Amino acid sequence: MSGGGAPGPASSWVLTDLLAQTLKPEFTWRELRPGVDEHRLYGSNDGDGPTASILRYAPGANVPYHRHGGHEHVFVLAGSQRDERGTYRARTLVINPPGTRHDVVSDEGCTVLLIWERPVTFVDR
């Protein structure tokens, strides 16, 4: 696979220079929440089960406090994002275990590869 879009069933694909791929016009985005756009690589639209996406945060964008039902893998491709535990810059991999609770903010904007095993639940602090 060479652009945006998920592979068909039982197919393999390779995205070389993932950050550069996100700049191509055929790489489609949808608004996930204000200031955060998503390009879904695979997974269901209702977020049930494993899902992989590229998220693009505008400067100052955030995702409110939530709980992870499964592991979350975040690879920061460009920019930075932060949560209660620290600031994560480009080329940083963060793996959050099931049950992790946090909110995420990107002061400067960022692009991340995000893989969820299970959906997140928005919760009060």
Which stretches of residues belong to each language-model region?
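A short, N-terminal "cap"/entry segment at the start of jelly-roll beta-barrel domains
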Residues: 1-49, 125
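Conserved hydrophobic/aromatic beta-strand scaffold that supports enzyme active sites
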Residues: 38-40, 52-54, 73, 93-95, ...
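Short histidine-centered beta-strand/loop micro-motifs
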Residues: 43, 53-55, 64-68, 85-86, ...
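Structural motif
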Residues: 50-52, 110-111
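Glycine- and acidic-residue-biased ligand/ion/polar-headgroup-sensing regions
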Residues: 58-61, 68-83, 90
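Short acidic-glycine-tyrosine-enriched beta hairpin
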Residues: 82-106
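Ligand-binding loop in jelly-roll beta-barrel domains
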Residues: 98-123
